[in-house]
Amino acid sequence: MAQKTLLIITDGIGYRKDSDHNAFFHAKKPTYDLMFKTLPYSLIDTHGLSVGLPKGQMGNSEVGHMCIGAGRVLYQDLVRISLSLQNDELKNNPAFLNTIQKSHVVHLMGLMSDGGVHSHIEHFIALALECEKSHKKVCLHLITDGRDVAPKSALTYLKQMQNICNENIQIATISGRFYAMDRDNRFERIELAYNSLMGLNHTPLSPSEYIQSQYDKNITDEFIIPACFKNYCGMQDDESFIFINFRNDRAREIVSALGQKEFNSFKRQAFKKLHIATMTPYDNSFPYPVLFPKESVQNTLAEVVSQHNLTQSHIAETEKYAHVTFFINGGVETPFKNENRVLIQSPKVTTYDLKPEMSAKGVTLAVLEQMRLGTDLIIVNFANGDMVGHTGNFEASIKAVEAVDACLGEILSLAKELDYAMLLTSDHGNCERMKDENQNPLTNHTAGSVYCFVLGNGVKSIKNGALNNIASSVLKLMGIKAPATMDEPLF
């Protein structure tokens, strides 16, 4: 069976029986139509307990790629941290205690929602209450979501935060995630969020009034303009700061702005000393204490391929590059032996519905080049279904699917010509459901199944399964015995 193999991840394209508001169903997709007729396919679970998340929790790109690469179910940070907090272990957490003991004032910042992709509001509340038990003054810096949850749900989450506020816990600032959680080096966005932390951009309104004023201007949660509230005078030297997001990719830039001595992305008010801690490891170069260090993941797909002295190439555009490198390799930043990485720049647009094809063509050209070079394993992510789906724009999401389909057609044709095997699946769904039951735009991921197609010598049928079955399936196509730590293949 041994073949050179393609692992294609069509981000955000999921399975849904209903056709209403289903961008995948309504797209013209001759390549998918061909695969449905000629290739064995099945359905793959991407959410909840199947990927180490709480029951019913929607999957996401980080969790999905980690599970794909590991070939087994991993307890994700959300579950691990929640269990720790439920067991009252925070009072014995050395990184947490050391950080809050260094100052009377503790700043907590993070995404205020229960989306569970980057953070969870229960973690936010638990840390604030634990700080209060230690007689600290707690400043809450709220980042509104509107992307992993409904676009106008911030007031609901705000009430939960206000329920714990008192003379010791106060809401200091607010910012839409578009500004405070950029990951594409758009530091003009980070600067606005940073300035609010410094006590600039004051509003006389209360937090709830300010959110409503943004809604009145047709600004939804994701894009709420950073502001700080009365009685907040800004962060001061020698105070403590904890960023409560457990996912790292959208936390790095704001933490860099706060803590890095050498920082030139914008002119800032710098600190002599700020006692920073992060929920999980955000970057290997960061010297900050970590409340929940990563658990080591051994024998990932990329590592096993490297151990067999085979070549591999990981390809994606900017928005998903971390997912096909750091996350799919089990949280390992450094490439393995014989691992090549190709980064295609994502288009510089405000939102991707303005360019639904994104950089899929550039990604495809890189894949075709690696195939012609004879690379043994090619892992590629197409970001369109997810990134355009997040905008809530149905017509643009249809175009996104059509762009991916055209690219898949080129890849599938060359795969057959060069005798490449192929496994195509998604890390989670998104664009197959673009409106909720009330006909409001749905911008978050779906908690459902995705397709899995296989092109391989002798493969006539494949079983239903989950993302933890992908790595062993890829290794089987390559003629490599999967390690005992991996779950069974799909065929």
UniProtKB/Swiss-Prot annotation:
GO biological process entries: glucose catabolic process; glycolytic process
Pfam families: iPGM_N, Metalloenzyme
Cofactor annotation: Mn(2+)
Catalytic activity field: (2R)-2-phosphoglycerate = (2R)-3-phosphoglycerate
Keywords from the named record: Glycolysis, Isomerase, Manganese, Metal-binding
Active site: 61 (phosphoserine intermediate)
Binding site for Mn(2+) 1: 386, 390, 445
UniProt binding sites for Mn(2+) 2: 11, 61, 427-428
Pathway: Carbohydrate degradation; glycolysis; pyruvate from D-glyceraldehyde 3-phosphate: step 3/5
Domain of life, source organism: Bacteria
Binding residues annotated for substrate, in chain numbering: 118, 147-148, 177, 183, 247-250, 320
Enzyme Commission number, as recorded: 5.4.2.12
Cofactor, free-text remark: Binds 2 manganese ions per subunit.
GO molecular function terms noted in the UniProt entry: manganese ion binding; phosphoglycerate mutase activity
Entry-linked InterPro entries: Alkaline_phosphatase_core_sf, BPG-indep_PGM_N, Metalloenzyme, PGAM_B_sf, Pgm_bpd_ind
CC annotations in GO: cytosol
Top EC class of this enzyme: isomerase
Function text: Catalyzes the interconversion of 2-phosphoglycerate and 3-phosphoglycerate.
Similarity field: Belongs to the BPG-independent phosphoglycerate mutase family.
Subunit comment: Monomer.
UniProt-recorded name of the protein: 2,3-bisphosphoglycerate-independent phosphoglycerate mutase
Source organism (scientific name): Helicobacter pylori (strain J99 / ATCC 700824)
